[in-house]
Each structure stands twice: as structure tokens, then as C-alpha cells.
Amino acid sequence: MGVFNFEDETTSIVAPARLYKALVTDSDNLIPKVIDAIQSIEIVEGNGGAGTIKKLTFVEGGETKYDLHKVDLVDDVNFAYNYSIVGGGGLPDTVEKISFESKLSAGPDGGSIAKLTVKYFTKGDAAPSEEEIKGGKARGDGLFKALEGYVLANPDY
């Protein structure tokens, strides 16, 4: 099995606590309201903490598909959240799982710095394609910006 790491960092004008609430605490309810392609997020097993399995149902290319996410870490104090895609339609054939390690910290002017490490655990030594990496980054950036936009549009949130 090969492991391929990718790191990304972005900033937001939203404070870490408010952004974490949207990205993690309320995400199961908020994401399907904000992202049209995502129909639902439901807990299949667990209580929301580490070890929980979530099913994310989405529409892609006119087809309804799903991903299974395993929660690896929830740290509400340090605004950290880690999870892995462990099954479903979002995994390329050459990938066993994709892990995401995210952390929000204080940024300039009361905003946030979001750091993300993505690890592709591949079958054999196959590296993820450039297309897979770019597509995943685009989806992640879109999700982040949509939730950030929701928080900015709802000051009482």
C-alpha cells in the first residue's frame, strides 16, 4: 500500500469557533441545506465521536451515490476534526481510503487559518491521479466556501 500526502491551507474572515460550528458541529444538518448535490448525512453507527460511521448521500452525474465516513478525531477545544472516507462511490478504484486531518486556528483580524492534510492510502503503489487530486481539492474548497458564506450571511449563527 502506498501513502500519498497533500497539504493545503486557506484563510477565512470568520472566527475559528463559528467556522468550526458550521464545518463540524452542525455539519450533518447544515451541509445538505447549503450544498445542493448532498442529499443527506446520517449516522450509521456511533454517537458522533471518534469511531462513528456516517453515510453521506449525494448526486453525481445524475446518479445517487454515497460515501462512508469514519470519524477519527473530534477536538472541540482545539478546533480539530479528522475523518476518513472508507467506502462508497467517492473512492477511486485504486484507493483503499482517504484520510482528512483538519485544524482551525486564529488568523488575522479575528478570522481563521484552516489547515488540511489529505492522505491517500492506495492499493499497491498506484499514486492518485492529478485529476483525482484536483477534483477532491475543488470539492473541498467548494464545501468550505459554501459553509463560510452561510456563516457570513447569518450573523446570528
Curated annotation (Swiss-Prot):
A GO CC term attached to the entry = cytoplasm
Q: Name one Pfam family in it.
A: Bet_v_1
Q: List the expressing tissues.
A: Expressed in roots. Detected in nodules and leaves, but not in stems and flowers.
Question: What does the entry say induces or represses the expression of this protein?
Answer: Not induced during nodulation. Up-regulated upon pathogen infection.
- State if NAD is listed as a keyword: no
Keyword terms, alphabetized: Pathogenesis-related protein, Plant defense
Protein's name in the database: Class-10 pathogenesis-related protein 1
What species is given as this protein's source? Medicago truncatula (Barrel medic)
